[in-house]
């Protein structure tokens, strides 16, 4: 959209944006009133113009205005605050943006027994943050299994797969720092364009590399980001 067309439905200069997430929580390239602009690095930019949570911040924050209003109107503000306080106290964590998000995401694991996350555009979050999310998601899955004996017949650990554009069959910091169990393999589709005759050699390379490096990849032949 042109700036003129965007402004026709998004009034960026309004002071009402202070009642949304607030500048302690997010940055935005839409020049929203009172909000910081995105940076230039992968982890600080506003991807595709979307608001970006400040997961790198070490500052403690209170609940954002929109959640305070929403939960108060639903009559569950005290309950939500108590659950958050219990999570932070039990795990001895500061009330940072990252740790709030870890709490909310792992609630899905603790409540429904979700046993893995597929993490989109992983390069836009510091890899240490992904490792922290996996740590607490793993604990939440253990909690769910203890509370729901017999509901599953497998005890595999919580699993994460990351998507980082153009990642191939290689061991790097996504595995070692981000603690991903697998990364999406963009190279498979590219190699396949050379013809099906390459498959035996390609499979051998992938198998040998994954075995040697003790890694796993998730390969695909087509996606909404690419073409076959």
Predicted regions and their residues:
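Active-site rim elements
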Residues: 88-94, 118-121, 227-228
């Amino acid at each position: 959209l042109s700036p003129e067309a965007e402004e026709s439905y998004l009034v960026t200069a309004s002071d009402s944006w202070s009642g949304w997430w607030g500048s302690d929580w997010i940055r935005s390239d839409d020049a929203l009133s009172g909000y910081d602009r995105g940076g230039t690095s992968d982890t600080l930019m506003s991807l595709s113009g979307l608001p970006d949570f400040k997961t790198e911040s070490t500052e403690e924050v209170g609940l954002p205005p929109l959640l305070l209003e929403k939960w108060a109107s639903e009559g569950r503000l005290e309950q939500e605050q108590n659950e958050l306080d219990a999570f932070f106290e039990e795990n001895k964590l500061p009330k940072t943006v990252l740790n709030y998000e870890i709490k909310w995401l792992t609630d899905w694991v603790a409540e429904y027994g979700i046993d893995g996350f597929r993490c989109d555009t992983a390069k836009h979050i510091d890899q240490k943050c992904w490792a922290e999310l996996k740590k607490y998601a793993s604990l939440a899955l253990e909690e769910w299994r203890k509370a729901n004996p017999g509901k599953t017949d497998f005890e595999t650990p919580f699993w994460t797969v990351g998507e980082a554009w153009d990642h191939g069959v290689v061991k790097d910091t996504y595995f070692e720092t981000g603690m991903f169990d697998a990364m999406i393999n963009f190279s498979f589709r590219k190699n396949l364009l050379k013809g099906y005759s390459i498959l035996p050699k390609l499979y051998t390379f992938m198998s040998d590399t994954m075995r040697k490096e003790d890694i796993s990849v998730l390969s695909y032949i087509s996606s909404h980001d690419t073409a076959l």
